[in-house]
């Protein structure tokens, strides 16, 4: 046994585990189109766990968005979702919607949001894998970072709040609006509705805390 002192890390609260899981799911939905296994799991999935207290308006909207996403999964086929994902976020020549959230942030000659993001990730010891083709500001990567912050509990709640407000919330809402405006967004219209509602829940929670 190592001589290093053992450290007890308490488990995540049910609320934080639900947050981390939902960030992970949203990251998966936007990183690549859902395959047959994920669609099957979502068809059987229950709504995100809620507290015993009555739901807020934001919580009710999130639950409704979840129900709509599950319903969309019932009639979805992987091949069609692959086509939709490709057309919306990859494109042949140019995607209909950019999934890189720094594109929805103000940029000045003095500051590049992506460079600032990379600097923040480097402070936490995070870096893009060499084989990764997507930049760090891809919506999926930012959601994965939020999940890492919640599950790792190394940076604390204030770091979650700062990262969320600095890189995720406002540009995420603009991304959701851009996807919703696309006529070709069928399944992903429901995915961005879930994301939008979840971001609103997170924003209110951070504002209260």
What residue spans do the PLM features occupy?
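Surface/interface-facing alpha-helical segments and adjacent flexible terminal/loop regions used
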Residues: 1-209
């Amino acid at each position: 046994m190592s001589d290093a002192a053992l450290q007890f890390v308490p488990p995540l609260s049910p609320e934080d585990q639900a947050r981390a899981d939902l960030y992970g799911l949203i990251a998966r939905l936007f990183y690549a189109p859902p395959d047959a296994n994920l669609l099957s799991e979502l068809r059987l999935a229950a709504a995100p766990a809620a507290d015993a207290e009555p739901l807020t308006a934001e919580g009710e909207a999130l639950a409704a968005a979840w129900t709509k996403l599950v319903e969309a999964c019932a009639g979805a086929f992987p091949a069609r979702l692959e086509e939709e994902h490709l057309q919306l976020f990859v494109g042949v020549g140019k995607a209909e919607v950019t999934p890189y959230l720094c594109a929805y942030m103000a940029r000045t000659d003095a500051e590049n949001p992506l460079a600032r993001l990379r600097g923040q990730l480097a402070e936490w010891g995070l870096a893009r894998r060499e084989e990764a083709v997507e930049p760090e500001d891809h919506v999926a990567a930012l959601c994965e970072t939020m999940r890492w912050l919640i599950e790792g509990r190394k940076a604390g709640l204030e770091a979650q709040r700062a990262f969320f407000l600095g890189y995720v919330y406002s540009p995420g809402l603009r991304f959701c609006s851009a996807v919703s405006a696309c006529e070709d967004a069928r399944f992903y219209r429901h995915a961005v509705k879930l994301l939008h509602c979840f971001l609103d829940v997170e924003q209110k929670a951070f504002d209260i805390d």
